[in-house]
Amino acid sequence: SLLNMKYYYLILLFFLIACDENNDDCCPIIDFGQREDLIIENTVFKISYNELKEQPNWIEYTVRDFVKVADRGNMDFYLEKNIKTSDDNDYYNNKWDKGHMAPAGSFTDSWSNLAKTFSFVNCALQVDNLNRGEWRELEEEVRSIARTSGPVKVRIELKFSNSSQVLETGATVPDGFYKFLTFTDNSKQCFYFEN
């Protein structure tokens, strides 16, 4: 009815007057879209992703002996629909590499699995010398163990603190990485890599 319509317009007018542009705290903008513990699982990994930090919290995967059928070639990282992740801008012209958490070289058993490792949800800001050095060497060692002794379960936990660096682009740089290995005999090893 016309009376109801006038009533709604009157309420809207009062609301707009109360929330003028000089009153910033009246109508806060709340972003309900950023999640701190988004669980993503596929045939390669299970991951807890933090959209506020634009980095993983942790990731789990298993390295197995396999026949290589795919090669990374010119594959590059891609964004996931409806997930706020880091992107190419976070890695441009600085010392940070796009560090695979679940390594591409451990999932060349199929093109589909290899491609999944190039999602930005599987990527962390990792100092270049670490990514290309000790981190890569341990990935290769784990593959070697999987070939000779059976599957190796891997869990990586990213360490953040109140003093973690936040880039101008908004992504948070991990302070370090814990890598836990569990072998077929249930023995375990843990490594810590400072970032």
What are these regions (language model features)?
Residues M5-I11:
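Sec-dependent signal peptide recognition
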Residues L16-A18:
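C-terminal motif of bacterial Sec signal peptides marking the signal peptidase cleavage site
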Residues D20-N22:
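Bacterial signal peptide processing site
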Residues D25-N42:
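Post-signal peptide N-terminal segment of mature Sec-exported envelope proteins
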Residues R35-D37, V44-Y49, T169, Y178-T182:
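Short, surface-exposed beta-strand/loop micro-motifs that present aromatic residues
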Residues I39-D97:
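Short, His- and charge-rich active-site/binding loops that engage polyanionic ligands
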Residues K81-N195:
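Domain-level detector of nuclease and nuclease-like folds
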